[in-house]
Amino acid sequence: MIIGVPKEIKNNENRVGMTPAGVAELVKKSHTVYVQATAGANSGFSDDDYIAVGAQILPAIEDVYAIADMIVKVKEPIAPEYKLIKKGQVVFTYFHFAADKLLTEAMIESGAVCIAYETVEKDDHSLPLLTPMSEVAGRMATQVGARFLEKPQGGKGKLMGGVPGVRPARVLILGGGVVGTNAAQMAAGMGAEVMITDVNLTRLRYLSEVLPKNVKTLYSSLHNIKMELPTVDLVIGSVLIPGDKAPHLITREMLKMMKPRTVLVDVAIDQGGCFETSHPTTHSEPTYVVDGIVHYAVANIPGAVPFTSTMALTNATLPYTVALACKGWKQACKDDPALALGLNVVEGKVTYKAVADVFGMRYEEIEL
């Protein structure tokens, strides 16, 4: 199979879909890999690194899409890429379709086979290709939240951990999954007072056992969230319904309950956001203010630490990439039910129910 690795063109997206180690694995199995020039530069990989393991370098993104049977990326294609995607071409990347109707329609029209990292799901409901980036995003959510609490960044001027004699910042984390757990670990390590919420009591019991003593757990309900808002300094939104739009846990009306310059970090923005007032931002312009509340809603948070996040992501995706290349997408998905759940749009049909439901489109079960 011919595999193409284009350079990411989303704003400040510095990751790359495949490392030289991944290329070497595919070349060893007699596949051909084309990498766009400088695609890996911001993750620490030179063109020479790719050439040394057997990749061929192409100068332009158009060249990569034109020649490849399968495209391996990090983030969803953006508008300039839509016309480059061919009928029957496999595109293996994060898509987050439920948050973007135009993207969904474009991929339907393209006739491509769109396999979304974020909906590959194992029998135990774990999300093996979302987990590594959720770990990075959770840790970074606390890191950026702490920065935007600083006065020069528009925040309250509070230090997360305080100092002796001065109370630390209070952090509310909505969602106790991978993102929330990692955010809580970071916030606790910085010395903040942390409250983490979830609707799953079994999960809350687990978190109570494994997280530090300065992290408390709370059942997630509208009433409980409202009770916390007047006293918090930082809110991290990390709720997830796989493949579906995130629910709005904080409405615009609820912003009035918070003190001015409270910081909201919406990690769920990829799936539409869990705050009513959220809209996607970029690393170059990461925040905006609504009713006195600072919002951070960068849609590719891990892109700011490309070395760490590229390595973590490709460690997880490579076995699936190899299976797709060696077997073809139909056989690979037939052999692996987890991978089959990644099929979101296939040759003009919406094959993931949550995506179809969000947009009122026809859902068609894929036959393998």
Predicted regions located by residue number:
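Glycine-rich phosphate/diphosphate-binding loop of Rossmann-like nucleotide-binding domains
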Residues: 6-45, 152-240, 287
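Rossmann-like adenosine-cofactor binding region
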Residues: 209-291
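An N-terminal-biased, well-structured beta-alpha scaffold segment characteristic
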Residues: 2-110
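Adenosine-phosphate binding glycine-rich loop
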Residues: 118-144, 148-159, 269, 274-368
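Short glycine-/small-residue-rich Rossmann-like dinucleotide-binding loops
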Residues: 69, 75-76, 95-96, 221, ...
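Glycine/serine-rich phosphate-binding loop and adjoining beta1-alpha1 elements at the start
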Residues: 2, 8, 77-169, 298-300
